UniProtKB/Swiss-Prot annotation:
The lineage of its organism: Bacteria, Pseudomonadati, Pseudomonadota, Gammaproteobacteria, Alteromonadales. Keywords: 4Fe-4S, Iron, Iron-sulfur, Metal-binding, Methyltransferase, rRNA processing, S-adenosyl-L-methionine, Transferase. NCBIfam families: PRK13168.1, rumA. [4Fe-4S] cluster binds at C83, C89, C92, C171. GO terms for molecular function: 4 iron, 4 sulfur cluster binding; iron ion binding; RNA binding; rRNA (uridine-C5-)-methyltransferase activity. It comes from Shewanella sediminis (strain HAW-EB3). Its EC number is 2.1.1.190. This is 23S rRNA (uracil(1939)-C(5))-methyltransferase RlmD.
Length: 442
């Protein structure tokens, strides 16, 4: 039998091709979507209702990716980005979209993802929790890179999908007093003899002042310590040096650790402890969670992934008995201290593996209501045993709607109804979507 040779398409020519496309919508990562030769093309930076010229950069069986080259006709929703480092820094990716449209896009993406992945709709869609669009971050970690040739430190954020550190001198989403510290700190760090030992820099806007936390892989020299101390006193900040083992030394006159308050509950935290970076949204989020759970003094509430007590302590203020569970021992210790400082004796904290079955733990007992605030990976393992506890109500705070949708399935199968769903706009100017869901046992 004769065999005929069929040449494969020239993929290099396909990828170098420039095409003009009509953008119809945004995907859940904020990239524009268009159609080309029967495939969906994802175009970062493009907006719906725009005609754009792009270069194809990746071809898959059912989709392609492209680089935005030129906007032939732009959307009425396109705005001028505020940050001079936008599209270089990998932090923000939606500054080119008006804030109102950012929020409506996120709301739609949340509802669509839940419907698509969990095959359910909420009985009630709550108003989005929103705050200021700029100057909202009370905490940020900046990376450092030492250049062996120039012998200089680059201080900034990493480029998108890259380890490259982009030099940053201002950050409009960071609280302005923290943003104003970046440039002088960059100058200071480059004056240190031990700058090669710099790991990262963390900036914190706490209720008791501003903090700069330097991660060092080697001990500071006396000369460098004096320079840092003088800077801390000049700027009236607390400067904390953190070593390899997590130990820290406070330099300067302000010898204290950071805290934030929720009403009359004070939450201390240390470098490395997780806290929500948007203070105003966190306050609204905690209030909404407490309202949705509607706890009563005779009820027992389980708070999984409790951290330093962000939800546990406000829940305990309602009079209910609260059990907080966390996988990081240092945060459990801090949560216990925070409860004691607030005079709350109706809350207990435990350290354990959150993926393990805790239903037989003697300290757990009956659970009337549940709050969980997991990391992006979600709480699928925990929900396998939690459903046996049959709490009457569950508030799930999610930083990844895909995980929330996946984790909803075992709850829905065991008689829970999705009563409420709401967007939490924790990170304006980015595509990141956070959400809160209320499940009740039918």
């Amino acid at each position: 039998m004769a065999q005929f040779f069929k040449a494969k398409p020239n993929s290099s020519k396909q990828l170098s091709a420039k095409v003009t496309l009509e953008v119809t919508k945004l995907d859940h990562l904020g990239a524009g979507m268009a159609q080309h030769q029967g495939k969906i093309v994802f175009i970062p930076g493009a907006l719906p209702n725009e005609k754009v010229t792009v270069q194809l950069t990746e071809q898959k069986k059912r989709h392609a990716r492209a680089k935005l080259l030129k906007i032939e006709s732009d959307s009425n929703d396109r705005v001028e980005p505020k940050c001079p480092h936008y599209q270089q820094c990998g932090g923000c990716d939606l500054q080119h979209l008006s804030i109102d449209k950012q929020r409506s896009y996120k709301q739609s993406a949340l509802v669509d993802l839940m419907a698509k992945l969990s095959h359910t709709e909420a009985e009630s869609l709550a108003p989005a929790l929103i705050g200021q669009e700029w100057d909202y971050r009370r905490r940020a970690r900046l990376a450092t890179h030492y250049n062996k040739e120039s012998k200089q430190i680059t201080l900034g954020f990493r480029a998108s999908a890259s380890k490259q550190v982009i030099n940053i001198d201002v950050c409009p989403v960071l609280a302005k007093p923290l943003s104003d510290l970046i440039a002088p700190l960059s100058l200071l760090l480059n004056q240190l003899s031990g700058k090669k030992a710099l790991g990262h820099l963390e900036l914190i806007d706490a209720d008791n002042g501003y903090f700069a936390v330097l991660r060092m892989t080697k001990a500071l020299s006396d000369k460098d310590a004096k320079k840092l101390t003088a800077f801390a006193n000049e700027k009236s900040i607390s400067l904390i040096v953190q070593g390899n083992e997590g130990e820290f030394t406070i330099l300067g006159d302000r010898n204290e650790l950071p805290y934030y308050a929720l009403d009359d509950v004070k939450l201390n935290f240390t470098p490395g402890n997780f806290i929500q970076v948007n203070a105003a949204i966190n306050e609204s989020m905690v209030k909404q969670a407490v309202d949705w759970l509607s706890v009563k003094p005779n009820e027992r509430v389980l708070d999984l992934f409790c951290g330093v007590g962000n939800f546990s302590l406000p829940l305990a203020k309602s009079g209910a008995e609260v059990i907080g569970v966390e996988g990081v021992p240092e945060m459990v210790k801090q949560a216990r201290e925070n409860a004691a400082d607030s005079g709350l004796d109706n809350v207990s904290f435990f350290h354990t593996d959150l993926s393990a079955d805790l239903s037989k733990e003697t300290w757990l007992g009956k659970v009337d209501k549940l709050l969980l605030d997991p990391a992006r990976a979600g709480a699928f393992e925990s929900l396998q045993w939690l459903k046996k506890m049959k709490p009457k109500a569950i508030v799930y705070v999610s930083c990844d709607p895909s995980s929330l949708a996946r984790d909803s399935e075992p709850l829905l199968k065991h008689g829970y109804k999705l009563k409420k769903l709401g967007l939490i706009d924790m990170f304006p100017q980015t595509h990141h979507i956070e959400a809160m869901a209320l499940f009740e046992l039918d």
